Amino acid sequence: MDLRVRTLLGGDRLRILLMFFHVMVQTVAEQEVENLSGLSTNPEKDIFVVRENGTTCLMAEFAAKFIVPYDVWASNYVDLITEQAEISLTRGAEVKGHCGHNESELEVFWVDHAYTLRMLFVKESHNTSKGPEATWNLNKVHFVYDSSEKTHFKAPVKVNKYIASSHHLSALVTPAGMSYECQAQQTISLASSDPQKTVTMILSAVHIQPFDIISDFVFSEEHKCPVDEQEQLEETLPLILGLILGLVIVITLVIYHIHHKMTANQVQIPRDRSQYKHMG
């Protein structure tokens, strides 16, 4: 009898230890997500950080706005008029996320879950003439909106929750190990579950890295979008041309000064032969 009791007690202890170990493993591998938007000097830009095991694995800074068309009744209550709701991602939003080796996700909720933005990032490898090349991109976007939310929707004909999404985007393409940066506005079209409606997502002041972050809370080297590179070239080109023009002017003045000095030191030969007798 004592042996059975001891065996049962031993089994219970083992189960308790296994449960404790399982909980500890879940806690260690748990990912925490932080909304650091209050640190941004731009009131329209949000900052989100996903950390795993105490290390940053996803960072995202951006300003987001959604242009959502919806129908309202005309004054005759017969015809329909399409209005547009402009919904901005606000500070203080609730955020979730997870990091993976080839897939990472960021999910943001605001206005009491009336709006949800889900962004899926994918890392892929491609064969090129230079060999295998890895890149990451924004692969999917889901935007859930509730037309019963009265701040942005004024007397809509249909009150419902809709999903606007875009699959296989391949947007924000960036070499692996780098962050993506773009100050210019970028638009992404999302097909809505509200028939014949297209939601426009506008991103700006973007700086994102969903993979391969080396230093905690620090972006890796930036991969700038083509629009930013063009604007940077347009800003620096006049400066470069001005420097070249200034250098040409300085060189011209130096050559003129040297030439003038050399000609001034040469003996002047008189053209009038009567003056030769005064020479010597």
From Swiss-Prot:
One GO term (biological process): presynaptic modulation of chemical synaptic transmission
Keyword Coiled coil: no
Glycosylation sites: N35, N53, N102, N127
Superkingdom, natural source: Eukaryota
Membrane topology value: Single-pass type I membrane protein
Post-translational modification note: Glycosylated.
Phenotype reported upon loss of the gene: Gross morphology and brain structure are normal. Behavioral assays of locomotory activity, exploratory behavior and motor coordination are also normal. However, some subtle behavioral defects are observed: anxiety levels are decreased and animals also show mild defects in odor discrimination. Electrophysiological assays of striatopallidal synapses indicate defects in short-term synaptic plasticity.
Tissue: In brain, strongly expressed in the globus pallidus/ventral pallidum complex, the substantia nigra pars reticulata and the entopeduncular nucleus (at protein level). Expressed in the external plexiform layer of the olfactory bulb (at protein level). May be weakly expressed in neocortex and striatum (at protein level). Highly expressed in brain; not detected in other tissues tested. Detected in the cingulate cortex, cortical plate and caudate putamen. In neocortex, specifically expressed in neurons of layers II/III and V.
Ranges per topology, Cytoplasmic: 257-280
Localization terms from the record: Cytoplasmic vesicle membrane; Cell membrane; Cell projection, Dendrite; Cytoplasmic vesicle, Secretory vesicle, Synaptic vesicle membrane
Extracellular side: 30-235
One cellular component (GO) term of this entry: synaptic vesicle
Chain ranges passing through the membrane: 236-256
Record keywords: Cell membrane, Cell projection, Cytoplasmic vesicle, Endosome, Glycoprotein, Membrane, Signal, Synapse, Transmembrane, Transmembrane helix
InterPro entries: Lamp2-like_luminal (IPR048528), Lysosome-assoc_membr_glycop (IPR002000)
Signal peptide: 1-29
Task of the protein: Plays a role in short-term synaptic plasticity in a subset of GABAergic neurons in the brain.
Family: Belongs to the LAMP family.
PANTHER family the record matches: LYSOSOME-ASSOCIATED MEMBRANE GLYCOPROTEIN, LYSOSOME-ASSOCIATED MEMBRANE GLYCOPROTEIN 5
UniProt-recorded name of the protein: Lysosome-associated membrane glycoprotein 5
Organism field: Mus musculus
